[in-house]
Design a protein with these regions (language model features):
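Non-catalytic alpha/beta scaffold blocks inside enzyme catalytic domains
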Residues: 1-151, 209, 213-264
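Long, low-complexity segments enriched in small/aliphatic residues
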Residues: 138-229
C-alpha cells in the first residue's frame, strides 16, 4: 500500500507517523513546527489549554485557515480561505457506519470555490502537479490506492443508494456487517489498560477540580450552533458547584464567581 501511494504521488513517505495535534503545538513553541493548514476545525476554541494553543498558533510562520466562519483560530491566521457549507458541497460523505453516500450541492459556494477547489489551488501554487476536475476523480484515486475502497465508484453508489466499506472486487457491493465470524487477526484480543492517574491534584490553593461538559442547545464547542437561535435557549455559560462546596465558600445560586487554576 505504501509503495502504491509513493508511486502515485511521486514522493517518499515518512517511515514514522507524523505529529498529533498536541505534539504540533509543542513543536511549534520549540521552533520545529512552522506551518499549519487548518481546514474546518477551530482548534483555538476546541482544544484544551487555550493559552498554550494560542501561543503555538502565534509562533508559526504560516497559518492557513479555511472555514465557513471567521472563528477563533482565524484570528491567528496569515491566510484565510472561505470554506463551503454542506449545502454547497458535491461529492460523498462517509459516516461512522462506514456508509458512503452521495452529496449534491443545493447552491453554488458563496465564497466562489468548493473546499476541494481551494485546496487544489493552494497545492498548485505550492508547485504540486494536481489536475483534478471534479470530486469523482478524487474518489477514483481513493479507490485506486485504498484497498478497502477499491470497489467504490460513483456509479455504484448511485445504483445502490449507498455503499459500506470494505467494498472490493471480492465484496463488490460493500460489507453491511464486519467481523461476523472472527477478526482479521483471529479471535478478539483483550488488553488490560494500566491506570494512569490524572496530573491534576487538589491542593490547599486549588482545592477543587473543574471539568467542562456539554449542554443540550450546543453541539460540541458550538462552532456552528452558537451562531444560530440556539444561543437564545442558553444565553450564557454557567458554573455548576456541589451545594456543600458552594455553601462553604459563601456562594449562592446565581452569584458571579471568579475562577483561577494553575495555568491561568
Amino acid at each position: 500500500v505504501r509503495e502504491s501511494f509513493e508511486d502515485a504521488w511521486g514522493v517518499k513517505l515518512d517511515a514514522e507517523p507524523g505529529h498529533r495535534i498536541p505534539n504540533m503545538f509543542d513543536e511549534a513553541l520549540s521552533g520545529g513546527f512552522k506551518g499549519l493548514y487548518c481546514q474546518g476545525e477551530d482548534i483555538a476554541q476546541s482544544d484544551p489549554n487555550t493559552r498554550h494553543v494560542e501561543a503555538a498558533l502565534e509562533s508559526m510562520e504560516c497559518l492557513i485557515v479555511q472555514d465557513i466562519f471567521l472563528n477563533e483560530t482565524a484570528k491567528f491566521a496569515h491566510v484565510f480561505l472561505p470554506g463551503s457549507s454542506f449545502l454547497e458541497k458535491d461529492g460523498t460523505f462517509t459516516n461512522a457506519e462506514r456508509r458512503i453516500s452521495r452529496v449534491r450541492k443545493a447552491m453554488e459556494p458563496l465564497g466562489g470555490k468548493a473546499d476541494w477547489e481551494a485546496t487544489l489551488g493552494l497545492a498548485q501554487a505550492l508547485g504540486c502537479d494536481w489536475d483534478y476536475e471534479n470530486p469523482e476523480q478524487i474518489m477514483a484515486e481513493i479507490a485506486a490506492l485504498t484497498p478497502s475502497f477499491a470497489g467504490v465508484t460513483y456509479e455504484k453508489i448511485e445504483r445502490l443508494g449507498s455503499v459500506q466499506w470494505p467494498c472490493t472486487d471480492v465484496v463488490s457491493e460493500g460489507t453491511p456487517t464486519m467481523h461476523e465470524d472472527s477478526f482479521t487477526r483471529g479471535l478478539g484480543q483483550f488488553v488490560v489498560t494500566e491506570y494512569v492517574p490524572t496530573v491534576e491534584r487538589c491542593t490547599r490553593r486549588f482545592p477543587l477540580i473543574m471539568t467542562t461538559g456539554r449542554i443540550l442547545s450546543q453541539y460540541n464547542v458550538g462552532a456552528q450552533t452558537r451562531r444560530t437561535e440556539n444561543s437564545t435557549w442558553h444565553a450564557e455559560d454557567v458554573l455548576e458547584i456541589h451545594p456543600a462546596d458552594a455553601e462553604s465558600r459563601g456562594i449562592s445560586d446565581g452569584d458571579w464567581v471568579g475562577i483561577a487554576s494553575r495555568i491561568g
